[in-house]
């Protein structure tokens, strides 16, 4: 069993490429998808401007109000069902879920978040409807893998205390699911070829080397590298950070294209 995360730019620009790669992959697979660029498009269609905030660490992320949460859930559902439709139409058995379905991924709403305002000053604001993942129902997800070839998961968690879906980070969803099912491999496929150091792709890192390297690379990628090291420590055999834009992206990554952390 492997877990594959495809980033929003891959979803927008190279989805067919990834679907063809899923069709070629012979084993069971969990596919976690992003879709931020498409969410922004639909937000604008609904007459609103998407809102982004920047953390003190320099990480830019979507701010999700109640109105934007509705658009986020609708858009992610559309992406999810489009992927499932294509997989089934081309011969794979597949099911599409969010973390809300069956309470498969439980989260908690971020009550407050710290941001940098337009003057570069730290400020605490209401957290909106973004969340942090608390638990994954590994038994439920594993039971689904016995029924289908591919599970497609949207990055939406369930906050049972506030009875609301939550926008959760797609990488976090993939890491947590991979840890829960003890995946043989976790693939993070985006629009970069791997972890870059001095303009060259780093081919292989131990978890210790990954933690050390994370201090030398930019925000965003450093978070992926740290989460990759944590995943390996918690039972995932290896994490591969690579490109979803290359031909047969999944098998290419498994064959050594990208950065492997193990």
From Swiss-Prot:
Reactions performed catalytically: [amino-group carrier protein]-C-terminal-N-(1,4-dicarboxybutan-1-yl)-L-glutamine + ATP = [amino-group carrier protein]-C-terminal-N-(1-carboxy-5-phosphooxy-5-oxopentan-1-yl)-L-glutamine + ADP; [amino-group carrier protein]-C-terminal-gamma-(L-glutamyl)-L-glutamate + ATP = [amino-group carrier protein]-C-terminal-gamma-(5-phospho-L-glutamyl)-L-glutamate + ADP
Keyword hit for Cytoplasm: yes
Location, primary (coarse class): cytoplasm
The UniProt record lists the keyword Metal-binding: no
Top EC category: transferase
Entry EC number(s): 2.7.2.17, 2.7.2.19
PANTHER family: N-ACETYLGLUTAMATE SYNTHASE, N-ACETYLGLUTAMATE SYNTHASE, MITOCHONDRIAL
Family: Belongs to the acetylglutamate kinase family. LysZ subfamily.
Entry-linked InterPro entries: AceGlu_kinase-like_sf, AcgluKinase_fam, Asp/Glu/Uridylate_kinase, LysZ
Residues annotated as site: Transition state stabilizer: 5, 224
Pfam families xref list: AA_kinase (PF00696)
Molecular function via GO: acetylglutamate kinase activity; ATP binding; N2-acetyl-L-aminoadipate kinase activity
Biochemical pathway: Amino-acid biosynthesis; L-lysine biosynthesis via AAA pathway; L-lysine from L-alpha-aminoadipate (Thermus route): step 2/5; Amino-acid biosynthesis; L-arginine biosynthesis
Signal peptide, first to last residue: none
CDD domains: AAK_NAGK-UC (cd04251)
Function: Involved in both the arginine and lysine biosynthetic pathways. Phosphorylates the LysW-bound precursors glutamate (for arginine biosynthesis), respectively alpha-aminoadipate (for lysine biosynthesis).
Positions that bind substrate: 35-36, 62, 167
Protein name (Swiss-Prot/TrEMBL): [LysW]-aminoadipate/[LysW]-glutamate kinase
One GO CC annotation: cytoplasm
GO biological process assignments: arginine biosynthetic process via ornithine; L-arginine biosynthetic process; lysine biosynthetic process via aminoadipic acid
Assigned keywords, A-Z: Amino-acid biosynthesis, Arginine biosynthesis, ATP-binding, Cytoplasm, Kinase, Lysine biosynthesis, Nucleotide-binding, Transferase
Subcellular localization: Cytoplasm
Cystine pairs: none
